[in-house]
Amino acid sequence: MMRTHYCGALNRNNIGQDVTLSGWVHRRRDLGGLIFIDMRDRDGIVQVCFDPKYQDALTAAAGLRNEFCIQIKGEVIARPENQINKNMATGEVEVLAKELRIYNASDVLPLDFNQNNTEEQRLKYRYLDLRRPEMAQRLKTRAKITSFVRRFMDDNGFLDIETPMLTKATPEGARDYLVPSRVHKGKFYALPQSPQLFKQLLMMSGFDRYYQIVKCFRDEDLRADRQPEFTQIDVETSFLTAPEVREIMERMVHDLWLDTIGVDLGKFPVMTWQEAMRRFGSDKPDLRNPLEMVDVADIVKDVEFKVFNEPANNPNGRVAVIRVPNGAEITRKQIDEYTQFVGIYGAKGLAWAKVNDINAGLEGVQSPIAKFLNEEVWKALAERVNAQTGDILFFGADKWQTTTDAMGALRLKLGCDLGLTRLDEWQPLWVIDFPMFERDEEGNLAAMHHPFTSPKDFSPEQLEADPTSAVANAYDMVINGYEVGGGSVRIFDPKMQQTVFRILGIDEEQQREKFGFLLDALKFGTPPHAGLAFGLDRLTMLLTGTENIRDVIAFPKTTAAACLMTEAPSFVNPQALEELAISVVKAE
């Protein structure tokens, strides 16, 4: 037998037992007559002692080095009282080695487990990076999460049904990864960005509660929390309203947090998209941050200051204030840095006012814009934002979107810089009632979620007449500023679906070409249905306390969508391309 116990599982209850362990040398210490090693496996670390009492094992241990793969047979004994290590789960015991077997020696590692290695090194030698206890723990947590989700879904009547990986390219927002067909030359499959249409078709097939833990693919620009291939917990239901879907999914996430890290998330508040954008400048607000935006356009619309009065009198403008309690200590240099920061989001500047004495009116205000205000305006501003002595007010004034984006980003930065964001808290919420459509860079209407989301209380005729007023029956789950899941009630009326396609500029010929199968299916007694998808990678990232999604994926890609370990993507044999009727055009 190669193993009777895992290293990290040993404790006082095992004292006196003979055990067989298999794993790696984590650290070695030679004390002359005795040799100690920390032995590691996926479950943890235990100290092993080589004693002259078992001379053969001691002699063999002299040749051990870090990362040798070994087997130990020995007895679990109690550590002397003065050698107990309370920082180790196994710190009360050690294993007295009777036999040592070396499965494999190890070359000197290209990584140093005791130092910070570069991201490039870690990804190139990922199989070594995953030996680190913190990395192993993250993947164990991920496995625990998926196991919990499957149990929850099974207990609530959901069926685990697989959907195709090779499918048809359909416009879902990002670029598709295309797969050429050898049999149908000149034609391509697409790897799914999500199982969206297939799970809707499953509802039409009568499977009223579906789920799947599934790989999805998007060829898009990457960030720290994005990967070209990622894993979704995909869910769809029939005959449930949006609040009913949210209740089930909230219960799952609530219980997942309790099961995984012992945290009770409580009841999730519900907030409309409009409120989230107005107060926090984001559709995924981090409620751990106490700072909020307050609209003041009505107060400053008549001041002799074009920076304020022009957006204040523009229906598409916005003037908003963030009050920072006790922020008057912020230096001019810091203010200049914040001014540069909001410029990233298109803001032309950042007005500010320090409240040195709230009872002194404008005399108690230190600000380059004080000369444009009068006592009445200042009093109204101070009351609106509840200004106090020692505060600083930051003003954003521009187009609605620019002000909202810039001040929302500033809010987050101020919360971090000033230690206002309560990092030890969990703050979940639902964001609902998103706009049905938004304008793209060319000014055309685009679906804010996807083109299969149903509007709220709109007929097809009303939607076509006034699409920009429509509210989507959509919902996102947000935790600590991260969107962890999003979904909607789906369109189940063929007339409504065709109307949405037309609004998005998809004519009837394109509708038949791209979505003919869906439009046909909608004609045959389609049930009302709604669903949601969670990002498993992002959930795991939050539950393990890391800020990089690559830390919770066994073999992730870089931000350039490359695998440094296998050197994918790579060139392929010209003969393979010829069989696919593909010729590669070299970039100039």
Curated annotation (Swiss-Prot):
Enzyme Commission code: 6.1.1.12
GO cellular component: cytoplasm
GO terms assigned for molecular function: aspartate-tRNA ligase activity; ATP binding; nucleic acid binding
Keyword NAD in annotation: no
Lineage top rank: taxon: Bacteria
Catalysed reaction equations from the record: tRNA(Asp) + L-aspartate + ATP = L-aspartyl-tRNA(Asp) + AMP + diphosphate
CDD domains named among the record's database cross-references: AspRS_core (cd00777), EcAspRS_like_N (cd04317)
Name by which UniProt lists this protein: Aspartate--tRNA ligase
Annotated organism of origin: Haemophilus influenzae (strain 86-028NP)
Recorded name of the encoding gene: aspS
